[in-house]
């Protein structure tokens, strides 16, 4: 099982760089490309409810993915950047991210299955196959992305949290020692 893999000291900065770039790739390139190909492959000239639902489902998925990735970019990465500076937010930790982290690649599987099952075969079948191929690749890419988050990024951030907490405890003890010496001197 992946949870039994030994901890390896990884660069949290390199992981965040990879994850941020992956977010931009998905949101700014891969998904817009799929949508463009999807529009080319489906027949929007007819009043086809399946076509409308496929587009609506895809657009809803993209919005959900944007929300998910923007949360990570704005909150999770900011939290980790502060940790790297030795600043620990007492109201947040990486376990909160883990508890709320949903795997958004499942909806792509649903979309692919809806297209395969309900979209009528037409003269643009090759184009739709290209769309399905892109969706399949996105599924795999997002699954890999989630594995990097779950099995590399989260354990690395947990280790960083531990180090920052230990450092804060050590600094607190060191700060209290001179006070104790002063109190002993003044009581004598």
Spans of features found by a protein language model:
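Small-residue-biased structural context
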Residues: 1-188
């Amino acid at each position: 099982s992946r949870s039994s893999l030994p901890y390896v000291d990884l660069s949290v900065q390199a992981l965040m760089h990879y994850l941020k770039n992956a977010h931009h790739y998905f949101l700014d390139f891969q998904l817009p490309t799929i949508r463009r190909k999807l529009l080319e492959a489906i027949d929007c000239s007819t009043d086809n409810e399946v076509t409308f639902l496929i587009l609506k489902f895809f657009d809803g998925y993209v919005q959900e993915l944007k929300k998910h990735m923007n949360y990570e970019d704005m909150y999770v990465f900011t939290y980790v950047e502060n940790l790297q500076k030795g600043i620990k937010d007492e109201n947040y930790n990486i376990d909160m991210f883990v508890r709320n982290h949903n795997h958004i690649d499942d909806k792509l599987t649903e979309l692919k299955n809806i297209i395969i099952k309900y979209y009528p075969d037409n003269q643009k079948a090759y184009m739709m196959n290209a769309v399905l191929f892109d969706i399949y690749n996105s599924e795999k890419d997002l699954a890999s992305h989630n594995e990097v988050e779950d099995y590399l990024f989260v354990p690395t951030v947990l280790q960083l949290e531990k180090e920052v907490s230990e450092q804060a405890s050590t600094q607190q003890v060191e700060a209290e020692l001179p006070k104790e010496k002063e109190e002993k001197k003044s009581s004598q």
